[in-house]
């Protein structure tokens, strides 16, 4: 039996992490605007989340005094171009029973690529799930255009996604 449940956006979260020159990292959060999870038994078989890119925050203490500057730069056309692409989405296409892996399509800056959420922990009673999605920002055009500065920023962005269903 398939059961589609809305995501509780106030208790769900997406934490991001990016690395610079392999030495230090920045991390923070973006809010989930809306979404749903489709459950079949103990597995998630479908669903989607819409991430509100306009809610980006920094939570690490490195350069915390410059948080507004960092977030503004990440929201700029150099990176996520939030003015033109205020949301990102992840649409679940399937999951592999017993592997804690969920597959889907991630859309950032209007570009959609297949991605994998790994190490997913499912809680069948509360209908919640937490997992890690790592993506190559270059595939989505998240880069300084033609700049050597781009080499200072690691290509991999990690998102820890924690979703709670509304029961």
Which stretches of residues belong to each language-model region?
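Low-complexity, acidic/polar, glycine-enriched regions of mature
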Residues: 1-167
């Amino acid at each position: 039996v398939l059961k589609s449940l809305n995501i509780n956006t106030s208790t769900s979260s997406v934490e991001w992490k990016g690395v610079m020159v392999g030495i230090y990292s920045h991390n923070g959060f973006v809010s989930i605007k809306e979404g749903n999870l489709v459950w079949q038994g103990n597995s998630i078989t479908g669903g989607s989340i819409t991430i509100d890119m306009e809610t980006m925050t920094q939570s690490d203490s490195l350069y915390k005094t410059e948080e507004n500057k960092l977030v503004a730069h990440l929201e700029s056309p150099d990176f996520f171009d939030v003015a033109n692409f205020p949301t990102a989405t992840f649409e679940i296409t399937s999951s592999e029973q017993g592997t804690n892996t969920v597959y889907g399509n991630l859309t950032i800056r209007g570009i959609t690529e297949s991605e994998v959420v790994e190490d997913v922990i499912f809680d069948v009673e509360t209908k919640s799930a937490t997992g890690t999605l790592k993506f190559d920002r270059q595939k989505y055009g998240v880069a300084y255009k033609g700049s050597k500065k781009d080499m200072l920023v690691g290509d991999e962005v990690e998102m820890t996604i924690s979703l709670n269903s509304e029961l």
